[in-house]
């Protein structure tokens, strides 16, 4: 446990240092931009003492500077002592709104819905997500994300399972390209 605390403390220190030394970039996404992000983090099943390692890969397209439509592929892997490890993959389209308060820190809120599957079952999943994109250069950002996922076999069951989902937090690096940026000379 002590090693894990040291790891988290080091990661938090590195993240804070990265944010503090980063040169603010004038790089807010514009309509027509594409975005790709790779992220890793942790997944915690609500009401349990277990968690899992999480890896995300996502692609998004900015419909406007605010609205982004995309798809996320995620893999949650649970390492179990004295038992079989387990995994759950999710494929979820998402729609988020990016708030442009300035050009280098872009918070967002959104929804995702799709399927969750493993080697035994396929179910539906949906939930809210939120986070912030901190631009480190014109086209590169640090992404901090949180999402809640709940699962259902039918839409009638979705309401009953709202408090039996997963909390997923990730940190990743993303790239934005394309779009119609105005150039200044």
Task: Give, region by region, the residue ranges found by the protein language model.
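Bacterial N-terminal signal peptides
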Residues: 11-21
């Amino acid at each position: 446990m002590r090693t894990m605390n040291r790891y988290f403390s080091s990661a938090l220190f590195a993240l804070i240092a990265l944010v503090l030394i980063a040169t603010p970039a004038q790089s807010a996404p514009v309509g027509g931009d594409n975005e790709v992000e790779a992220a890793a983090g942790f997944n915690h099943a609500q009401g349990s003492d277990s968690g899992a390692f999480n890896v995300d890969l996502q692609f998004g397209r900015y419909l406007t500077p605010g609205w982004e439509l995309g798809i996320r592929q995620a893999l949650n892997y649970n390492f179990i002592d004295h038992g079989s490890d387990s995994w759950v993959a999710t494929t979820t389209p998402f729609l988020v709104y990016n708030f442009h308060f300035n050009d280098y820190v872009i918070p967002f809120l959104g929804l995702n819905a799709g399927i969750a599957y493993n080697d035994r079952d396929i179910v539906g999943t949906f939930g809210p997500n939120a986070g912030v994109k901190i631009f480190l250069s014109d086209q590169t950002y640090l992404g901090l994300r949180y999402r809640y996922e709940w699962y259902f076999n039918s839409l009638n069951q979705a309401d009953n399972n709202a408090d039996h989902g997963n909390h997923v937090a990730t940190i990743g690096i993303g790239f934005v390209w394309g779009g119609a940026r105005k150039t200044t000379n």
